A protein has these predicted regions:
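Rossmann-fold cofactor-recognition segment
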Residues: 89-92
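Rossmann-fold NAD(P)-binding glycine/threonine-rich loop
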Residues: 133-175, 180-181
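Phosphate-coordination loops involved in phosphoryl transfer and adenosine-cofactor binding
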Residues: 44-47, 126, 187
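NAD(P)+-binding Rossmann beta1-loop-alpha1 motif at the extreme N-terminus of oxidoreductases
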Residues: 20-83
Length: 253
């Protein structure tokens, strides 16, 4: 069942209206995507929070800040990050401050993720949580550490029953996250999964703005391909190659 996602200013995912023209109304922003038939109009850009100051968290914050979003990078020790090279529009603060945003990305060490999201469950209620964490088996880097029948996305959704969990950015090596989007924007795909179709367009807009092409691979229960051990993990692929792997297990030429 879809959850109602309401932002602090009163903007809901339903306010992302499709319009034929690019005419702007006061207080709205039209966003055009290369593969979209019509622009997406929203009342304002959502505020972004990132939980985790490691390479993935910093990469996500950097790409979204460059795209014009206001980003709060949350960390356990904010004062220790003052010298990091980040866009000036990125604010560094505690986890609780980052969790106040409209859309929150999770990019912490997996062993810390459960305690963190449970402590922020009330703050994250009614929001979109984009889970980029990975749990891999200690005995095998390329195998999930969760049970065979449980995906990372489904596990995270069970911890946050009042949030809309989206699984994304889990299959791209951290050292390529910023460079591929910067050097070749709109070329490489990000596979994502969700159970709430009404948040997909907003998530896809964020992925486009970060320099990637969104490819939905299914529901959270179907997100094993972007978990450790999955056919897409850890790989960076074009949209056609990603779809071919998902459909046939073979890359397109």
């Amino acid at each position: 069942m879809s959850k109602a996602v309401t932002y602090r200013s009163g903007l809901t995912a339903g306010d992302a209206e499709s319009e034929q023209s690019g005419e702007l109304h006061a207080g709205s922003i039209a966003v055009w995507r290369p593969t979209a038939e019509r622009p997406i109009r929203v009342k304002r850009l959502p505020l972004i929070g990132v939980l985790g100051s490691g390479p993935v968290g910093r990469g996500v914050a950097t790409l979204l800040a460059r795209a014009g979003y206001k980003v709060t990078l949350g960390t356990r020790h904010p004062d220790s990050l003052v010298l990091l090279e980040l866009p000036v529009s990125v604010t560094i603060g505690p986890f609780d401050e980052a969790a106040k945003a409209d859309v929150v990305f999770l990019a912490v060490v997996h062993s810390a993720s459960r305690g963190l999201v449970e402590s922020l469950e009330e703050r994250l209620a009614g929001k979109i949580l984009v889970d980029a964490d990975n749990e891999w088996a200690r005995w095998h880097y390329a195998a999930t550490g969760l049970s065979d029948s449980l995906t990372e996305g489904s596990w995270m959704a069970s911890l946050l029953p009042h949030s809309s969990v989206v699984r994304a950015f889990s299959h791209i090596d951290w050292d390529l996250l910023v460079t591929r989007a910067t050097d070749e924007p709109g070329v490489w795909a990000v596979g994502y999964a969700s159970d709430d179709d009404h948040v997909d367009r907003l998530v896809e807009t964020l992925i486009w703005d970060m320099g990637y092409v969104p490819v939905k691979i299914g529901s959270l229960a179907e997100s094993a391909p972007i978990d450790p051990g999955g056919v897409l993990w850890p790989r960076i692929l074009t949209p056609d190659a990603m779809r071919a792997l998902l459909d046939t297990g073979e890359e397109s030429n």
